[in-house]
A protein has these predicted regions:
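Short, compositionally biased
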Residues: 182-199, 203
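Glycine-/charge-enriched secondary-structure boundary and capping motifs
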Residues: 2-19, 23-29, 107-130, 140-145, ...
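Glycine-rich anion/phosphate-binding loops
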Residues: 37, 69-85, 107-118
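Short Gly/Pro-enriched turn/cap motifs at secondary-structure boundaries
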Residues: 33-37, 215, 285-288
Length: 350
């Protein structure tokens, strides 16, 4: 979009900061009674009563977290919201409001920012959250997006990472590894395009993988499902950095160990096929790929009958004594130490 010479471009400088804010937020609607004042004043006003407030923030930077050569701006806006909402759902909460702050260089016209906010608005409508504020400023290079999500939950229903107990079952929603493989496909096609710009990629066999990378969904449905099943998790976390990294967070904060069974890890057929094509071990992709935004949680073993067989959930292991360590039980029955090899936000990737 940014390179389309035939498309009309409106400089952001023509609108100014407040003109831009008014322009990109005028179609956003308020859905929650707790939103007393959204965009348009010095601060948003929220009304809180019997619930506790959940707050989470994520920062996305061009060249570090996303590549606009294959990430459409509308998808970027959607994803920026979703990754924050996922954290609220991982606390067993309900997301209600977001703020969005952006820093953009002068290479982005108004039309590009409209695309970005179209994705943000779609996410707000899909997950029923209100945009209540944020900030805009200039950037010397690229685009930066910071989203803060605000949610709520009754005190007794909030689920932390530190509540896992010995013998608890380890459960994960959905399937793992697709987002990482979607990224590998997109990066491969980017390199092919550099060599031959006329080449049109055939991505029909990778639609699920690419969608999981470019337009992930937060599992708002899982806390609802668990409540319907009368299951209260003892600990929970969303899978942003990879299964191994996340279970290690739970075990560290809960002061327990774990056993994950390789043959129980849920994998989509496209993941298995793509792993064979790329000559990558599918288990390592699930353990270390990240960006799945599924929910990983523990439940008392007494809830086994409630959880087993549910098409949205997989029991992949159990919690052990801390002295037993953190282990992966392979299909051959061998026990291997789990290691965190997922995304490190502070690692220099260059």
């Amino acid at each position: 979009m940014l390179e389309d010479k035939n498309q009309s471009r409106t400089s952001l400088a023509e609108l100014g900061e407040f003109g831009l804010i008014n322009h990109i937020t005028k179609h956003f609607k308020v859905s929650h009674k707790t939103t007393v004042k959204a965009v348009g004043d010095d601060a948003a006003v929220l009304e809180r009563s019997e619930n506790q407030t959940l707050i989470t923030t994520d920062l996305l930077i061009e060249g570090v977290h996303f590549d606009l050569s294959y990430m459409p701006l509308k998808h970027l806006g959607y994803k920026a919201v979703v990754v924050n909402l996922s954290d609220v759902f991982a606390m067993n909460g309900v997301a209600e409001q977001i703020t969005v702050s952006i820093a953009v260089s002068n290479r982005f016209p108004l039309e590009a920012i409209e695309e970005l906010y179209a994705g943000i608005q779609l996410a707000c409508e899909t997950y029923t959250v209100d945009l209540i504020g944020g900030d805009t400023t200039s950037s010397t290079k690229g685009i930066l997006i910071s989203v803060t999500a605000v949610g709520k939950a009754p005190k007794e229903e909030i689920v932390y990472r530190n509540g896992a107990k010995e013998t608890d079952l380890i459960v994960v929603s959905g399937d793992l590894g697709a987002a990482y493989l979607g990224l590998q496909v997109l990066e491969r096609e980017k390199q092919v395009f550099k060599v031959n710009p006329k080449n049109q990629p055939d991505l029909d066999n990778y639609t699920y993988l690419i969608e999981r990378q470019l337009k992930p969904e937060a599992r708002k449905d899982i806390p609802v499902l668990l409540k319907e099943m009368d299951v209260h998790p003892t600990s929970m976390i969303d899978i942003s950095d990879g299964l191994s990294s996340e279970i290690m967070h739970i075990c560290s904060q809960s002061e327990v160990g774990c056993k994950i069974y390789e043959d129980k890890i849920p994998l989509d057929p496209q993941v298995i096929s793509a792993c064979e094509e790329f000559d990558i071990d599918s288990t390592m992709v699930a353990l270390s790929g990240g960006e799945d935004y599924e929910l990983l949680f523990t439940v008392p073993i007494a809830d086994f009958e409630k959880v087993k067989g549910n098409p949205h959930l997989s029991i992949i292991g159990h919690i052990t004594n801390q002295s037993a360590g953190l282990n992966l039980v392979t299909r051959a029955g061998q026990e291997l130490e789990l290691k965190a090899q997922g995304w490190n936000a502070l690692e220099n990737k260059q």
